[in-house]
């Protein structure tokens, strides 16, 4: 406890000296802190360099804080907001967990390497572990986006079949598969690095993956193949949505089977009852015929919801593509061209491009905030320390209606409506009749629209 107190005191002294621009500090605050705690000697393996070389890089701490905080807000929103409880948002929450771990475990160590001019300042056995975590979370990000793209395409293409396998448990199983693939890609790195340090060190000082075969195979498995699948399925999703919208606009959509009691007569004569029902396939009422010809509002609204959600996810895909492609393309070129390329230039480009990729982990919450009202409202509440979900207004339900169907009365009940309110039409009240209880009726307009609306709450 005494050693820890001395270490903290030493760290604060050096930090205050830095803030007042006393540049004669020979040992960095972080180096002094860790050195005092572990009390390492010059002959040990754990030895810091002489001092920090790049103090302006500390400004990157702002990016790290925003990345961690933004993704925590996403995780809280999906956990607390019932409107966000669907398969796509579960994937987005898992993606936010991966991005948050990038900010917690990967970006700080990368910043530390920059501060020491890319000379690894920590124990050498931590280098392959850090590279493995970097590959794990980067692979998890692209795999999540690929899985989201596939899941949404299947949901829009075959909504009924997808709804049978779209429970919360099935979504968790899909997410577990994504993480299993990501772990499988990253696990070989510490094994390779601990066996041969040359595979994870360049010039015996810089911690970077130095195995050409693994770089090539890993780049294709973890990035280019999932990226190709993601782009193809996203384009197919947009194509299906456009085709469905055009079919609705031109009236070439098949109406679902429905129950339509067009004409119901209840007669009571001399103790006998007769029921006559008109042919449901014939409709002589012109107003009713016009209503039939209208397009289903639920289906069109569902397609609009899907298109809005696809735009948001499309922006996420595009940002990921733009911010990670430079790194992976440069990584492949540095291996393929070998000594023919300027390796120092390649290293500098990779150092810049990898941080552009890291920034992508902090941009996704910003995309959700700008383009989704539910996320925006949730983030605003959480920043004001309001963690309770908003109470929904009471739902207006139709009371039970007691209708007396007189003898000879014409009771017209139309069940196929876009609301839950049955429609009772004219009656002849000259003769006594029977009493009917009309309950609340809830019939879906279109099964595909119901499924689609449940999916597209992004």
Curated annotation (Swiss-Prot):
Signal peptide region: 1-32
Membrane topology: Multi-pass membrane protein
Lineage, opening ranks: Eukaryota, Metazoa, Chordata, Craniata, Vertebrata
Pfam families from the UniProt entry: 7tm_1
Residue ranges annotated as motif NPxxY motif: 364-368
Sorted UniProt keywords: Behavior, Cell membrane, Disulfide bond, G-protein coupled receptor, Glycoprotein, Membrane, Receptor, Signal, Transducer, Transmembrane, Transmembrane helix
Designated name of the protein: 5-hydroxytryptamine receptor 2C
InterPro entries tied to this protein: 5HT2C_rcpt, 5HT_rcpt, GPCR_Rhodpsn, GPCR_Rhodpsn_7TM
Residues reported to bind ergotamine: 139, 209
């Amino acid at each position: 406890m005494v050693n820890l107190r001395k270490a903290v005191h030493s760290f604060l002294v050096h930090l205050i000296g830095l803030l007042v621009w006393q540049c004669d500090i020979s040992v960095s605050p972080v180096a002094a802190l860790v050195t005092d705690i572990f009390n390492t000697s010059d002959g040990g393996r754990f030895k810091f360099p002489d001092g920090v070389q790049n103090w302006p890089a500390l400004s990157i701490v702002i990016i790290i804080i925003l990345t961690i905080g933004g993704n925590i807000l996403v995780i809280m929103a999906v956990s607390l907001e019932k409107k966000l409880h669907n398969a796509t948002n579960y994937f987005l929450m898992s993606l936010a967990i991966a991005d948050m771990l990038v900010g917690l475990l990967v970006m700080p160590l990368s910043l530390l390497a920059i501060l020491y001019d890319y000379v690894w300042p920590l124990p050498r056995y931590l280098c392959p572990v850090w590279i493995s975590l970097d590959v794990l979370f980067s692979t998890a990000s692209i795999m999540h986006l690929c899985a989201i793209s596939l899941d949404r395409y299947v949901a829009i293409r075959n909504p009924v079949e997808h709804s049978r396998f779209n429970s919360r448990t099935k979504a968790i199983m899909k997410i577990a598969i994504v993480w299993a693939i990501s772990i499988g890609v990253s696990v070989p790195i510490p094994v390779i690095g601990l066996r041969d340090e040359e595979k994870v060190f360049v010039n015996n000082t810089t911690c970077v993956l130095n195995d050409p075969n693994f770089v090539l195979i890993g780049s294709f498995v973890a990035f280019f193949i999932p990226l190709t699948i993601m782009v193809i399925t996203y384009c197919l999703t947009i194509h299906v949505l456009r085709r469905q919208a055009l079919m609705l606009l031109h009236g070439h959509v098949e109406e679902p089977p429905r129950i339509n009691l067009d004409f119901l007569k209840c007669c009571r004569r001399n103790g006998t009852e007769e029921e006559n029902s008109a042919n449901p396939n014939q409709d002589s009422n012109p107003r009713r015929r016009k209503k039939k010809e209208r397009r289903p509002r639920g289906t069109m609204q569902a397609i609009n919801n899907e298109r809005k959600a696809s735009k948001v996810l499309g922006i996420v895909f595009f940002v990921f593509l733009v911010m990670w492609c430079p790194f992976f393309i440069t990584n492949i070129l540095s291996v393929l061209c070998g000594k023919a390329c300027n390796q120092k230039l390649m290293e500098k480009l990779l150092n810049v491009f990898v941080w552009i990729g890291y920034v992508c982990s902090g941009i996704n919450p910003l995309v959700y905030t700008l383009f989704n009202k539910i996320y925006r409202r949730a983030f605003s509440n959480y920043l004001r320390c309001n963690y309770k979900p908003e109470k929904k207004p009471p739902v207006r339900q139709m009371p039970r209606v007691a209708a007396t169907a007189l003898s000879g009365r014409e009771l017209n009940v139309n069940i196929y409506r876009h609301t839950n309110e049955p429609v009772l039409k004219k009656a002849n009240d000259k003769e006594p009749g029977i009493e009917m209880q009309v309950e609340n009726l809830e019939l879906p307009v279109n099964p595909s629209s119901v499924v689609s609306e449940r999916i597209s709450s992004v």
